[in-house]
Amino acid sequence: MFLLYEYDIFWAFLIISSAIPVLAFLISGVLSPIRKGPEKLSSYESGIEPIGDAWLQFRIRYYMFALVFVVFDVETVFLYPWAMSFDVLGVSAFLEAFIFVLILILGLVYAWRKGALEWS
């Protein structure tokens, strides 16, 4: 028998966790001062007057490093639950995880060969 009251705690958590950020934005909007002076409109750079233009174009190299980092960070997130239940899953899960890591290593070698990891 499927009973919906089993999910009451889930819905309560979902509503509360959605309401907290909305309330935080509403309260900060109501309580914050609206006056905009010259100091508030100026750009801030570590307590020093900014030198040059505030809008700089970043090289694509930074994005490639960030992309490779995100890929391997997500790999860690996927492999952690597998590592915690390694003894229960057996050989087939080990082979699947091995193939997953092998594909990621091949991707890293490809990015390395293409020069995506070169800093200069």
UniProtKB/Swiss-Prot annotation:
Pfam families: Oxidored_q4 (PF00507). Gene3D superfamilies: NADH:ubiquinone/plastoquinone oxidoreductase, chain 3. It is a multi-pass membrane protein. The chain crosses the membrane at residues 9-29, 64-84, 88-108. Its EC number is 7.1.1.-. GO terms for cellular component: chloroplast thylakoid membrane; NADH dehydrogenase complex. It comes from the Eukaryota. Keywords: Chloroplast, Membrane, NAD, NADP, Plastid, Plastoquinone, Quinone, Thylakoid, Translocase, Transmembrane, Transmembrane helix, Transport. InterPro entries: NAD(P)H_OxRDtase_bac/plastid, NADH_UbQ/plastoQ_OxRdtase_su3, NDAH_ubi_oxred_su3_sf. Its main location: plastid. GO terms for biological process: photosynthesis, light reaction. It is found in: Plastid, Chloroplast thylakoid membrane. GO terms for molecular function: NADH dehydrogenase (ubiquinone) activity; quinone binding. It is an enzyme of class 7 (translocase). It catalyses: a plastoquinone + NADH + (n+1) H(+)(in) = a plastoquinol + NAD(+) + n H(+)(out); a plastoquinone + NADPH + (n+1) H(+)(in) = a plastoquinol + NADP(+) + n H(+)(out). NDH is composed of at least 16 different subunits, 5 of which are encoded in the nucleus. NDH shuttles electrons from NAD(P)H:plastoquinone, via FMN and iron-sulfur (Fe-S) centers, to quinones in the photosynthetic chain and possibly in a chloroplast respiratory chain. The immediate electron acceptor for the enzyme in this species is believed to be plastoquinone. Couples the redox reaction to proton translocation, and thus conserves the redox energy in a proton gradient. Belongs to the complex I subunit 3 family. This is NAD(P)H-quinone oxidoreductase subunit 3, chloroplastic. It comes from Draba nemorosa.
